[in-house]
UniProtKB/Swiss-Prot annotation:
The modification Phosphoserine is found at S56. The gene is TCP11L1. Residues 21-33 have a biased composition (Acidic residues). Residues 1-60 are annotated as: Disordered. It comes from Homo sapiens. InterPro entries: Tcp11. This is T-complex protein 11-like protein 1. The lineage of its organism: Eukaryota, Metazoa, Chordata, Craniata, Vertebrata. GO terms for biological process: signal transduction. Transmembrane segments: none annotated. GO terms for cellular component: microtubule.
Amino acid sequence: MSENLDKSNVNEAGKSKSNDSEEGLEDAVEGADEALQKAIKSDSSSPQRVQRPHSSPPRFVTVEELLETARGVTNMALAHEIVVNGDFQIKPVELPENSLKKRVKEIVHKAFWDCLSVQLSEDPPAYDHAIKLVGEIKETLLSFLLPGHTRLRNQITEVLDLDLIKQEAENGALDISKLAEFIIGMMGTLCAPARDEEVKKLKDIKEIVPLFREIFSVLDLMKVDMANFAISSIRPHLMQQSVEYERKKFQEILERQPNSLDFVTQWLEEASEDLMTQKYKHALPVGGMAAGSGDMPRLSPVAVQNYAYLKLLKWDHLQRPFPETVLMDQSRFHELQLQLEQLTILGAVLLVTFSMAAPGISSQADFAEKLKMIVKILLTDMHLPSFHLKDVLTTIGEKVCLEVSSCLSLCGSSPFTTDKETVLKGQIQAVASPDDPIRRIMESRILTFLETYLASGHQKPLPTVPGGLSPVQRELEEVAIKFARLVNYNKMVFCPYYDAILSKILVRS
């Protein structure tokens, strides 16, 4: 995820990494309101929120309290994103085309640069605006320096001495081109390698106003680079503190909004009830008679939590609100859910194919991998609105039959008969239905594997993959590791809340 955030705040966070840990984390997330506020507003206005159960009595809140809560959510979300998303980067702000903000910005900037052009065209030239720009450039260059850059700091301070520049301007001795040359050279020294080309192009601009305009444009890009460098530098520091920080921020939100655990409670209650029902069915004696009260299965808090996390992989994101404590990772859980749905279809297709084909064909690694890649490619757009699973499975059936026939021919085995082709195509097309037995078996085994992995404490090696899932073992293990990381981090942050809720639920049950 990349966000359009305030660069200077994140940059300062990088400089503060040697300070107190709590202050460092506060600095890292300071000033992020604008970028994430839209997500908060859209979530609060979503129809899903209308369904909130009122387990806590309603109370009136002030606008200030709401804004403070929003800021807390924003800062917590940003800290979480930096820690959880290893690819997190800030990107330059790009205003939408033809938007009011973009037009206003262009008008204001044009007026400013036109004014500068007029001043420099006077006889003698007026350098008031130009000197202010040099001052801004000086501060920006100094902000890029680390504490050990003493020589560069002295050079910038000496050459871009505003008092001396003003005196030279008053005496008609100011060489603005010489200052620009020094600035470009210093930018080349401080910029990231990715900006070398942009800095090099500045040397080809001869007119002062266009040159200054492009200098500021490149400096903005360098600010983004510096902010991302700061984030990568402080990420290990944030990892150590983020659990306490997120828990603290959530507690502050909970104190302002006492009903902020309603959906979590509902989520854990459902998980407990579902798990109890499953265990009770398994505990029934042969013949279906009810077991005695002493034989009733008992649930552990850990088992309920793990099962609750598995339920997130079958969530109806359009109809049901996501539990509050996992809301920041909703997109990640949803992405894993989509990956597992695709793996389920892929695994089911491969299972019926290898079951119908000649014995031993699945043991040919090259063929199995080739067939998997073909099906995988055809399922790539599975979750796009324009994707029609039935039609694609028809195409997959045709392609699979061709590949199987070709493989059998090369191996010298008996040819794949027309009757077998018809049956195989029919079984592959049947996978389109969520109630298809093969598809349900694959889904159940995948969830069992994930549950076993969570229960094992994420130890290596991973649990043995259930039967029928060997062709998709690598993909399944990758998903399992991502899923376990999300779950583990969420548990570390919110375990005290889960324990408190489950202690009441399990006593009642």
